[in-house]
Amino acid sequence: GHGTVTIGAVEKFLTETAWREGWVAPIRPSVERSQTIGIVGAGPAGLAAAERLRTRGYQVVVYDRHDRVGGLLIYGIPNFKLEKSVVERRTERLIDGGVTFELKCNVVEDVSFADLRAKHDAVVIATGVYKAKPLNAPNDGGVVAALDFLIAANRVGLGDEAPDFSSGRLNAKDRRVVVIGGGDTAMDCVRTARRQGAASVTCLYR
């Protein structure tokens, strides 16, 4: 008689209550170790590794080419699905716990992998996957990768420059949009296109 239970809403309520009431424990290593660990990538995997290693007392430095911590949590997932503040408070917890972030640092271009190996006792590679699988279909000139579209939309939402959005290439306003796929990423594209004012949005799914 009480209707459905929205698990996501319950989990969010519990999590928000924990943060508000101070139940989320700070990172406090039981022992400080002298060994340093370099982590390449500040996305979900890199952040998880940083927390686990720092909790065990290692000195952790996370390198990322972007200017914000979070990877696809920040740039790939729309704000209506995951608020950026959720990622930012996790980042602050890591910083308060002693994790160091080196942002705008492109490994290989700005610092060599050999230098990282020489600087740290170990290096964790947590770069994620940003390259899309091409469709390779005839006349695919108007096809854009979902991640490119979502990243541009997120950058606009963050107040960053997004040339491909400004030029109209990755702006769905007044466009007839077709999204191929029916997974989470496809739904993010559908909802983003609608919010941008697309003339129509059609989802093709097998």
Residue ranges and their predicted role:
Residues 1-2:
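Local cysteine-cluster metal-coordination motifs and their immediate loop/turn environment
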Residues 5:
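Charged, alpha-helix-enriched surfaces in structured cytosolic catalytic cores
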Residues 11-206:
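Residues forming the flavin
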